[in-house]
Each structure stands twice: as C-alpha cells, then as structure tokens.
C-alpha cells in the first residue's frame, strides 16, 4: 500500500474507513487492559479517529502515528482542540494536553517516542495493510512496543475475494500465525457485523466478522 494511495483518499475525503462513532469493542473491552489513568497509549495509523478522544477521556496520554497531514489537522479541528506543532526529524509533531500525534511514516518512527507506553490500540492499522505488507507492519509494531505492554486489537474478516480492500480481511489464523512470536493473544469477542456495513452488503459479501483480541507484548 503506497503512501500516495492514502494521501489521495484523504485529499478526496474518500474516508469510508473513518468511523463516525467510537468503536463498540473499545468501549466494551478497554477496561480489561487494566491500565491506570495517566498511562501512555499508542495508536498506530490513527487517522482522525474519535477513539482517541475516548482514550483521552479515560485519563490516558495518547500517542498516535499517522501518515497523512490532513488527517492529523482534521482531528484537532473537528474536536476543537488547540494544538502546537513542531518538527521531530522527518516527522511533524502535533500535540495538545493529552494527545500527541506524529505525522509521518510509522516505519521510521523513533522507538524513543513509544518507549514508555504501557498500552496500545489497533483498530484500523493491521487491517489497512494487504497481506504482502501486513507481517512487516506487525513486526514494526512489536519493535515499537515495550515488553509487557498490553493492547486491544480489532480486526475484520470476510472472504477476501468478495471485496478488494482496504480494509483487508485478517483471519484468526493469520493473527495467531504472525503475532504469536511477539505477543500473548486472547480472543475477547467475535461478532457478525455485516448488517452494520452497507458497503459490504452492497457488494454482496456473504459474511463479515469483527473480532477483538487482547495482546500482551512478550
């Protein structure tokens, strides 16, 4: 998935992947991570997700990484948050009291930025990558996370041949095969969400499962 693809999507506001509401699995299961208020939480490929507002409301310090500048700017504008901007190497750093977003390539994000995080949340990152690039992202995520950090992973799974991603289908088998070397994995929930996703219904995708996993960095 080339950077130009995502920049074009944001420029044209073709952002069907952006959810207008907080993810239900986040609301339902975040407490199972048992993170204290004040804990740093990393959100990879964060876009302008409202989920970051939920995490901040839990008292966390949110650290996000997003490739597209417009997405980062819209997060602060849409939520009427004052922010400051500064350069950090090849990344731009946008921050307010509880949210720090780093605009740039996650593969070149300095590990020092996430060195003190104790939690992480991935709803739209893993499923954004085609299978040919997904394992590389998963390894980069693991390298950015300290040992013992805990996170909530949300995936979508469906017959990939029925629809071209993103979001791409990520099966439970893929999660176990590619993440188990770096994470302890616990499946928390899996639900059929086809009726809630008109794009998939329109394309006659036969089923669509959303799953939530608790991950712990080994």
Curated annotation (Swiss-Prot):
Keywords: Cytoplasm, Methyltransferase, S-adenosyl-L-methionine, Transferase. Its EC number is 2.1.1.67. The keyword Chloroplast does not apply. The keyword Nucleotidyltransferase does not apply. It holds the Pfam family TPMT. GO terms for biological process: methylation; response to metal ion. Its main location: cytoplasm. Belongs to the class I-like SAM-binding methyltransferase superfamily. TPMT family. This is Thiopurine S-methyltransferase. The gene is tpm.
């Amino acid at each position: 998935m080339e950077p130009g693809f995502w920049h074009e999507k944001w420029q044209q506001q073709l952002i069907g992947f952006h959810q207008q509401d907080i993810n239900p699995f986040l609301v339902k299961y975040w407490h199972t991570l048992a993170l204290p208020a004040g804990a740093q939480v990393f959100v990879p490929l964060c876009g302008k997700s409202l989920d970051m507002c939920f995490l901040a409301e839990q008292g966390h310090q949110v650290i996000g990484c997003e490739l597209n500048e417009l997405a980062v700017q819209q997060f602060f504008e849409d939520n009427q948050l004052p922010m400051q901007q500064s350069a950090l190497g090849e990344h731009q750093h946008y921050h307010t009291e509880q949210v720090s977003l780093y605009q740039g390539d996650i593969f070149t994000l300095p590990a020092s930025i996430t060195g003190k995080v104790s939690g992480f949340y991935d709803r739209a990152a893993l499923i954004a990558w085609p299978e040919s690039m997904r394992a590389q992202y998963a390894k980069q995520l693991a390298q950015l996370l300290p040992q013992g950090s805990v996170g909530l992973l949300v995936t979508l799974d469906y017959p990939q041949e029925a629809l071209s991603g993103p979001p791409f289908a990520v099966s439970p088998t893929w999660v176990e095969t590619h993440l188990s070397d770096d994470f302890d994995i616990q499946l928390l929930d899996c639900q059929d969400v086809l009726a809630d996703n008109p794009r998939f219904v329109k394309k006659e995708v036969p089923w669509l499962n959303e799953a939530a996993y608790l991950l712990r960095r080994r």
